[in-house]
Amino acid sequence: MDLKTLIREIPDFPKPGILFRDYTTVLKDPQGWRYSIDRLTELIKPLEPTAIVGIESRGFILGAPLAYQLGLGFVPVRKPGKLPADTHSVEYELEYGSDRLEIHQDALAPGDRVVVVDDLIATGGTASATATLIDRCSATLAGFAFVIELEGLNGRDRLPEVPIISLVSYD
């Protein structure tokens, strides 16, 4: 299936000069949505994860059904102040600013093998920050999985050397 035909492009969002790739148009298409989950499940399974980590918020949309399909637990990585227990926190740079992410300190344990899921990788800042959080939990990063990769922004270069899965790439 060619997911590119389902992904909407929105110029100058969230600020001028950014071309936003909108995955929500895939979510509303039953075949596109099913293909995304089924294909990512197929590609993630050989990495032998013990948990799926989803990055707020579109990583939740993908990560929860992937964890379910794989028979694994799902761990959310959230923006500050959204998790009720003790957290690890990291600041990171975005394509269009900076932010912080948090994970519960007890969300992962030594021996856990984690695949991080999000809808899109651009500069790699969010994914790299999430890798730092996984390390702070003493878990092992097994890989990353994205639906969309913006290759021209070289996000892969900021990530640890683990498998990186993407279903659609743009230059």
Curated annotation (Swiss-Prot):
Q: Which Gene Ontology molecular-function terms are recorded?
A: adenine binding; adenine phosphoribosyltransferase activity; AMP binding
Compartment annotation: Cytoplasm
- UniProt keyword list: Cytoplasm, Glycosyltransferase, Purine salvage, Transferase
Q: Which GO terms describe its biological process?
A: adenine salvage; AMP salvage; purine ribonucleoside salvage
The catalytic activity of this protein is classed by the Enzyme Commission as 2.4.2.7
Q: In which pathway does it act?
A: Purine metabolism; AMP biosynthesis via salvage pathway; AMP from adenine: step 1/1
UniProt xrefs under SUPFAM superfamilies: PRTase-like (SSF53271)
Gene Ontology cellular component annotations, sorted alphabetically: cytoplasm
InterPro entries, sorted: Ade_phspho_trans, PRibTrfase_dom, PRTase-like, UPRTase/APRTase
Q: How does it assemble?
A: Homodimer.
Q: What functional role does this protein have?
A: Catalyzes a salvage reaction resulting in the formation of AMP, that is energically less costly than de novo synthesis.
Report what the protein is called.
Adenine phosphoribosyltransferase
Q: Which organism is it from?
A: Synechococcus sp. (strain ATCC 27144 / PCC 6301 / SAUG 1402/1) (Anacystis nidulans)
Gene (UniProt): apt
